[in-house]
Swiss-Prot record:
Record's protein name: Netrin receptor UNC5C
Death domain span: 850-929
Gene3D superfamilies found in the cross-reference section: 2.60.220.30, Death Domain, Fas, Immunoglobulins, Thrombospondin type-1 (TSP1) repeat
Gene symbol of the encoding locus: UNC5C
GO molecular function: netrin receptor activity
Keywords: Cell membrane, Cell projection, Developmental protein, Disulfide bond, Glycoprotein, Immunoglobulin domain, Membrane, Phosphoprotein, Receptor, Repeat, Signal, Synapse, Synaptosome, Transmembrane, Transmembrane helix
Topological domains annotated Cytoplasmic: 402-931
Length: 931
């Protein structure tokens, strides 16, 4: 009724006095008369209204200084609602579209001393009974209507609800037993209540504050997460829900952090316990590293080990019997002897005591004395001379033997040098020709190419894999060229054989292309085709490297308020920038840097880059690596093994990966094949010269990782070389089966062309392809036409993995001397925009995004919140990452923006929201003109 009256007054231009006297008062009288027993009350109501009202004074519309606030009735206590407006002659409350009787109003009027305007303040009291008597889907509400001579003003609606908090928790925490440093999740869903209950956690009846103890984290769903369980975290945990009505406690959940026992190191072996004969030695260990705690498992195994030992018994020595006395000597003595061998002392036994020799006089002291003879002196002199002569002869013989041995050793050195094929160091004599008994064998059916083998030979003896000098050399590259004829190739024809594999290159072309390599390597450092940069503030934006599949999404709010960052994203193409990989590992993405390093971000950015893996997680172990500055490459996270402390989240789509991170650095994705069924995608691209004035025509077959940047690099390289794309590139699934890649050419018109490859096919070794670390890997097929009048080449090229998949290219090339123009259908000429700043970078308008976040961030009892949104968008592989963010919905929408850039599939998003029952958001999308 009030709305109709006000509308009438506004349309007719009537004063408020006339409106109240002619319309409002009679209507109120009729309403009063319709209620029995209320006549006297209505008379009082009319008497209290003023007799006259001022008409059309120059006053403004009423302005509310105080508007009614939402209130909750606790138990049976009524609540008061207040309104205050100026200038206002009257203020009345309207509750649930019905006017509140004047007698229920408490009115206070005064005149503002400063402005001279009437200030009116009114309050009413709402009881529990009034709220309970209301029927219908809408809650009990009241609003104020203020009058002045200029018109009426309505306040906002204030809802009055009966506060309550149910006793039963919807989900209570459960006790757990966990090992040390394990992540613990305690779930809690508070009981239903109005207003919504606040949740806190108690540990042994003390409130947990995650700010003080960062090992605890309370999610937006009220769950408690213990990041790494400690022994001190063994306690009783209680979930507490409270509002203005009551405080409820859940059942206590006991968390026990146990420690499994671990063995200490073994002690040294003890000495053998037997001093003589068989015994044993032992060593021990204890279950104290660590000792089991809180029910942890005891160490498995024995704590004592014993081994048999044998200690030899000591044997004391004993004398043998004395020998017979010797004959009487010239000095009138004779002697006898004995030995300590019956038995000899062993194993530490005692030695014999006493004399070994015993002598005594054999003539009873009657011994003759003879004068010295001069013959004895001559005898002694002769003996000395003989000894000296023997020593001299020995020295001469020794010198002769030494010289003979030295000469033979020198001959051995000369002989060994002959085995080097004639490449002797300086100052060493040439080898004797008679030592080259066996000539080199040139009858093998395969010719091998290895870079280091030909370091001392002429360049013409090499069998190159490619004739393109602009490409970086491939170290230790080996290619087998299989000859079907099996004929022996003479040594003097080796140079001609190698020249048949690739065309001759003039010296001037070689020098020019070498110069191009140098210029290109310098240009790569600042190549704008590999880098995008821009200046961003808190509004965010998007950096895109055209035609490379690499971009960086900076969400709104990622850059702190009030700061401006010069940000960039770049692709590194130098092989030295790539992470080292092991035999079974492969590089799946380009190496991408984003910066500036160390920049403070308040929410994750999304780094997007193409990958070449067939993402079957049963066959792969995929991990993200990063490099800080010039330091070593470090592991960040293994996909599928994330935990609460993981700093990044990886969304792996069929062709691209999206990395959510708050750390700007250098990143790359590395895969390790678990089974031989693991496969990576290769992009096969075939190029030929734009114009050809010679008889030779070269076809280059590139085998690249199936990423946009790898193909873009080759297209740029061929453009510089004057090459053209001969056929649409094709994809090949290359399995980790260790089988090589085989390339062959077929169906050549032999009357017009001949192949200069003296083999049936070429092969690229498996690991050269699988590692993903060799850029621009390719093979060259050289054909020769018999006449310059031949202007067309028709043939087939087959590329396949041995015992695997393959692709066939049907080539129909035009060969002419004049350039026909280069067409690169892969290069998107429209993709020149690299930087988008502000709201234009995002598909979802900011107001709708804010509305989505405010409605989906809060957990819902039916689950119609951000978790369902992640599930519907297939982004629910690891929900705990989003749960740790202040706005999980915002991070999910950031990831959706990166996935659907640049088209922005809003129709799909609207359909998902429609399924979730978010009709108002779908209507908002339609109103924005984006749906």
């Amino acid at each position: 009724m009030g709305k109709g009256l006000e509308g009438t007054a506004a349309r007719c231009g009537l004063g408020m006095g006339y409106l109240l006297h002619s319309v409002v008062l009679p209507a109120l009288a009729v309403l009063g008369a319709s209620r029995p027993g209320s006549a006297a009350q209505d008379d009082d109501f009319f008497h209290e209204l003023p007799e006259t009202f001022p008409s059309d004074p120059p006053e403004p519309l009423p302005h509310f200084l105080i508007e009614p606030e939402e209130a909750y009735i606790v138990k049976n206590k009524p609540v008061n609602l207040y309104c205050k407006a100026s200038p206002a002659t009257q203020i009345y409350f309207k509750c649930n579209s019905e006017w509140v009787h004047q007698k229920d109003h408490v009115v206070d009027e005064r005149v503002d001393e400063t402005s001279g305007l009437i200030v009116c303040e009114v309050s009413i009291e709402i009881s529990r009974q009034q709220v309970e008597e209301l029927f219908g889907p809408e809650d009990y509400w009241c609003q104020c209507v203020a009058w002045s001579s200029a018109g009426t003003t309505k306040s906002r609606k204030a809802y009055v609800r009966i506060a309550y908090l149910r006793k039963t928790f919807e989900q209570e925490p459960l006790g757990k037993e966990v090992s040390l440093e394990q992540e613990v999740l305690l779930q809690c869903r508070p009981p239903e209540g109005i207003p919504v209950a606040e949740v806190e956690w108690l540990k042994n009846e003390e409130v947990i504050d995650p700010v003080e103890d960062r090992n605890f984290y309370i999610t937006i769903d009220h769950n408690l997460i213990i990041k790494q369980a400690r022994l001190s975290d063994t306690a009783n945990y209680t979930c507490v829900a409270k509002n203005i009505v009551a405080k409820r406690k859940s059942t206590t959940a006991t968390v026990i952090v146990y420690v499994n026992g671990g063995w200490s190191t073994w002690t040294e072996w003890s000495a053998c316990n037997s001093r003589c004969g068989r015994g044993f030695q032992k060593r021990t260990r204890t279950c104290t590293n660590p000792a089991p705690l809180n029910g942890g498992a005891f160490c498995e195994g024995q704590n004592v080990q014993k081994i048999a030992c044998t200690t030899l018994c000591p044997v004391d020595g004993k004398w043998t019997s004395w020998s017979k006395w010797s004959t009487c000597g010239t000095e009138c003595t004779h002697w006898r002897r004995r030995e300590c061998t019956a038995p000899a002392p062993k194993n530490g036994g005692k030695d014999c005591e006493g004399l070994v020799l015993q002598s005594k006089n054999c003539t009873d002291g009657l011994c003759m004395q003879a004068a010295p003879d001069s013959d004895d002196v001559a005898l002694y002199v002769g003996i000395v001379i003989a000894v000296i002569v023997c020593l001299a002869i020995s020295v001469v013989v020794a010198l002769f033997v030494y010289r003979k041995n030295h000469r033979d050793f020198e001959s051995d050195i000369i002989d060994s040098s002959a085995l080097n094929g004639g490449f002797q160091p300086v100052n060493i004599k040439a080898a004797r020709q008679d030592l080259l008994a066996v000539p080199p064998d040139l009858t093998s059916a395969a010719a091998m190419y290895r870079g280091p083998v030909y370091a001392l030979h002429d360049v013409s003896d090499k069998i190159p894999m490619t004739n393109s000098p602009i490409l970086d050399p491939l170290p230790n590259l080996k290619i087998k060229v299989y000859n079907t004829s099996g004929a022996v190739t003479p040594q003097d024809e080796l140079s001609d054989f190698s020249s048949k594999l690739s065309p001759q290159i003039t010296q001037s072309l070689l020098e020019n292309e070498t110069l191009n390599v140098k210029n290109q390597s310098l240009a790569r450092q600042t190549d704008p085709s590999c880098t995008a940069f821009g200046t961003f503030n808190s509004l965010g934006g998007h950096l895109v490297i055209p035609n490379s599949g690499v971009s960086l999404l900076i969400p709104a709010g990622a850059v702190p308020q009030g700061r401006v960052y010069e940000m960039y994203v770049t692709v590194h193409r130098k092989e030295g920038m790539r992470p080292p990989v092991e035999d079974s590992q492969t590089l799946l993405t380009p190496v991408v840097s984003c910066g500036p390093p160390g920049a403070l971000l308040t929410r994750p950015v999304v780094l997007t880059m193409h990958h070449c893996a067939e993402p079957n997680m049963d066959d792969w172990q995929i991990q993200l690596k990063h490099q800080a500055g010039q330091g070593p490459w470090e592991d960040v996270v293994v996909v599928g093994e994330e935990n609460f402390t993981t700093p990044c989240y990886i969304q792996l789509d069929p062709e691209a990966c999206h990395i959510l991170t708050e750390t700007l650095s250098t990143y790359a994705l590395v895969g390790q094949s678990i089974t031989k069924a693991a496969a990576k995608r290769l992009k096969l691209a075939i190029f030929g010269p734009l114009s050809c004035s010679s008889l030779e025509y070269s076809i280059r077959v590139y085998c690249l990782d199936d990423t946009q940047d790898a193909l873009k690099e080759v297209l740029q390289l061929e453009r510089q070389m004057g090459g053209q794309l001969l056929e649409e590139p094709k994809t090949l699934h290359f399995k980790g089966s260790t089988h090589n890649l085989r390339l062959s050419i077929h169906d050549i018109a032999h009357s017009l062309w001949k192949s200069k490859l003296p083999a049936k096919y070429q092969e690229i070794p498996f690991y050269h392809i699988w590692s993903g670390c060799q850029r621009n890997l390719h093979c060259t097929f050289t054909l020769e036409r018999f006449s310059l009048n031949t202007l067309e080449l028709v043939c087939k090229l087959c590329v396949r993995q041995v015992e695997g998949e393959g692709q066939i290219f049907q080539l129909n090339c035009s060969v002419s001397e004049e350039p026909t123009g280069i067409d690169y259908p892969i290069m998107d000429s429209a993709g020149s925009i690299t930087t988008i700043v502000g709201p234009n970078a995002f598909s979802i308008p900011l107001p709708i995004r804010q509305k989505l976040c405010s409605s989906l961030d809060a957990p819902q009892t039916r689950g119609h919140d951000w978790r369902m949104l992640a599930h519907k968008l297939k982004l629910d592989r690891y929900l705990n990452y989003f749960a740790t963010k202040s706005s999980p919905t915002g991070v999910i929408l950031d990831l959706w923006e990166a996935q659907n850039f640049p088209d922005g599939n809003l129709s799909m998003l609207a359909a998902v929201l429609e399924e979730m029952g978010r009709h108002e958001t779908v209507v908002s999308l339609a109103a924005e003109g984006n749906y």
